[in-house]
Regions:
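Nucleotide-activated donor-binding/catalytic signature segment of Leloir-type glycosyltransferases, i.e.
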Residues: 36-38, 50-73
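Short acidic/histidine- and often glycine-rich active-site loop of Leloir-type glycosyltransferases
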Residues: 110-121, 125-127
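Short hydrophobic beta-strand element within catalytic cores of glycosyltransferases
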Residues: 101, 105-108
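Conserved donor-binding/catalytic core segment of Leloir-type glycosyltransferases
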Residues: 1-37
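Acidic donor-binding loop of glycosyltransferase active sites
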Residues: 8, 77-91, 104
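Short glycine/serine-rich donor-binding loops of glycosyltransferases
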Residues: 93-96, 114
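A short, well-ordered alpha-helix in the C-terminal region of glycosyltransferases
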Residues: 139-158, 164
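C-terminal "capping" alpha-helix adjacent to the active site of nucleotide-linked donor transferases
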Residues: 125-147
Length: 175
């Protein structure tokens, strides 16, 4: 069950493309705490963390480390919103779908697959820049958690994905 708090959530991998440093800027701009849950094992990830994230950690900006499934679900349930400030053409952002499945609002940068996965103003807020993402934080109460879950189930459930693959294979076979 969803019990949102005040904190925003960044969930991903420690890299400039994923943008934990941008999530920090958003959290600071709107005056909200931020939990950062991210994989940070590779040399590049560690270097990025040490240079761009670690200097900003305090009682409001917290790095919780890499998390397992149960911890991820708990963080999503407790988050005010998931922020996805990507700076690359993300081919498929599973974390956005996981958030929707939990009924957690998503605020994402309009890059890659984001506009295909998220429906701006209905299931999420999609922005063109960090200012737009920050402005969307105040609007997440407009999104209905039940509708977010229903959308995730209707579009991305295992049955839906399997049926989509079958249809694609049948179309290829039929030429």
């Amino acid at each position: 069950d969803r019990d949102p708090g005040e904190a925003l959530l960044f969930l991903g991998r420690m890299s400039p493309d994923k943008g934990a440093h941008r999530a920090i800027r958003i959290a600071r701009q709107v005056g909200r705490p931020l939990n950062i849950a991210a994989k940070c094992r590779e040399p590049g990830e560690i270097a990025y963390f040490e240079e761009h994230v670690e200097p900003h950690l305090d009682d409001q900006i917290v790095y919780v480390g890499e998390v397992d499934h149960d911890a991820k679900c708990r963080l999503l349930a407790e988050a005010h919103a998931l922020v996805v400030p990507i700076e690359w053409e993300e081919p498929f952002g599973l974390v956005m779908i996981e958030a929707l499945a939990c009924g957690t609002p998503v605020i994402a940068m309009r890059r890659g697959s984001v506009p295909e996965i998220l429906d701006h103003g209905r299931t999420a807020f999609v922005a063109d820049d960090l200012s737009g993402m920050a402005a969307a934080v105040a609007r997440v109460a407009e999104l209905d958690p039940a509708e977010l879950r229903e959308t995730a189930d209707a579009r991305f459930s295992v049955d839906q994905m399997v049926n989509g693959y079958i249809a694609a294979y049948e179309a290829m076979i039929d030429g």
